[in-house]
Amino acid sequence: MRNSIFEQEETFQDLSLRPKSIEKFVGQQRVVENLQVFIDSAQKRNDSLDHVLFCGPPGLGKTTLAHIISNELESRIHTTAGPLLSKAGDIAAILTNLHKNDILFIDEIHRLPSAVEEVLYPAMEDYHLDLIVGDGPAAKSIRINLAKFTLVAATTRIGMLSNPLRDRFGITLRLDFYTVSELLQLLQQAAERLSVNIENGAMIELAKRSRGTPRIALRLLKRVRDFLEVSDSDVITREFADLALNKMEVDQFGLDKLDYTYMDFIAKNYSDNPVGIKTIAAAISEKEDSIEELIEPYLIKIGFLSRTQRGRRLTGKALDYLSTINSARLP
């Protein structure tokens, strides 16, 4: 399993750092501008917002935007996740308790079983449920009308959604990795709210090592703050941040120990040939889903990895970087 600073449970403090309104949301400019139009239009029509699907890598703000939609529309939000909905009755119980204009947020919707998906089809399209009651010859179909609600869903694997489910979302918004300048703006806001005494150069260093991901940027800020609190310093300088990040084994690209384990395995055993995900997962004792969602997207983003149908292959850029790093490790 992944043992990393990048994989930790959200705390109450994490939640308190989330923006509550769309104007306070940092980054994802195109997504935010379009979402504002859709929200304003729904409010002008005095109608429910069309169903919304957010897709993109973890930690970019999909859940935050779902809650912002609820706040902007002044609607109640009900939250659940794909892995929690194992049978049709689970989703039916939630849907029948929704009120008009409520928001239902389903995280990891790509992990819904097909039986649950099929219940959602008529609920999303016509706002009713068709349930089978009883068994055998005595079984009968019952239709239950639902309040007009908005389904907001998030996925890191949009390709795993069935076409019928994906097509029922009227709004699909794709989130991308953040720029360093966007992360810097986010860190400035967070440092002020957390009362962290940090220089601008240190925040730039944090932003560069945050893998383009706000969630990681905030976690690194708090961990570097921990180093500050047990030191003799009273401010986080660039040098202090660099020292703390190096102690946490977060390099200049934001790569951590597991990223190196992944790349080292491929470089040492398959440097000239592609390798399959199952082989990698078995070798580094990690789940395929975790590799595909948490490791590979960023390696592809920075040009370290090529992913094809034949398998994974490290790029020349990655191999050169590993060679430099490994040379530095030698006594």
From Swiss-Prot:
GO cellular component terms, A-Z: cytoplasm; Holliday junction resolvase complex
Keyword Acyltransferase among UniProt keywords: no
EC numbers, comma separated: 3.6.4.-
Segments for region (Large ATPase domain (RuvB-L)): 1-178
Reactions performed catalytically: ATP + H2O = ADP + phosphate + H(+)
Binding site for Mg(2+): T63
Record has ATP-binding as a keyword: yes
A GO BP annotation: DNA repair
Annotated residues for binding of ATP: L17, R18, G59, K62, T63, T64, E125, D126, Y127, R168, Y178, R215
Keywords assigned: ATP-binding, Cytoplasm, DNA damage, DNA recombination, DNA repair, DNA-binding, Hydrolase, Nucleotide-binding
Location in the cell: Cytoplasm
Region described as Head domain (RuvB-H): 252-331
Annotated DNA binding sites: R307, R312
GO MF: ATP binding; ATP hydrolysis activity; four-way junction DNA binding; four-way junction helicase activity
Residue span of region Small ATPAse domain (RuvB-S): 179-249
Major location category of this protein: cytoplasm
Function as written in the Swiss-Prot or TrEMBL entry: The RuvA-RuvB-RuvC complex processes Holliday junction (HJ) DNA during genetic recombination and DNA repair, while the RuvA-RuvB complex plays an important role in the rescue of blocked DNA replication forks via replication fork reversal (RFR). RuvA specifically binds to HJ cruciform DNA, conferring on it an open structure. The RuvB hexamer acts as an ATP-dependent pump, pulling dsDNA into and through the RuvAB complex. RuvB forms 2 homohexamers on either side of HJ DNA bound by 1 or 2 RuvA tetramers; 4 subunits per hexamer contact DNA at a time.
Subunit structure: Homohexamer. Forms an RuvA(8)-RuvB(12)-Holliday junction (HJ) complex. HJ DNA is sandwiched between 2 RuvA tetramers; dsDNA enters through RuvA and exits via RuvB. An RuvB hexamer assembles on each DNA strand where it exits the tetramer. Each RuvB hexamer is contacted by two RuvA subunits (via domain III) on 2 adjacent RuvB subunits; this complex drives branch migration. In the full resolvosome a probable DNA-RuvA(4)-RuvB(12)-RuvC(2) complex forms which resolves the HJ.
Family: Belongs to the RuvB family.
UniProt note: domains: Has 3 domains, the large (RuvB-L) and small ATPase (RuvB-S) domains and the C-terminal head (RuvB-H) domain. The head domain binds DNA, while the ATPase domains jointly bind ATP, ADP or are empty depending on the state of the subunit in the translocation cycle. During a single DNA translocation step the structure of each domain remains the same, but their relative positions change.
Protein name: Holliday junction branch migration complex subunit RuvB
Organism the protein comes from: Neorickettsia sennetsu (strain ATCC VR-367 / Miyayama)
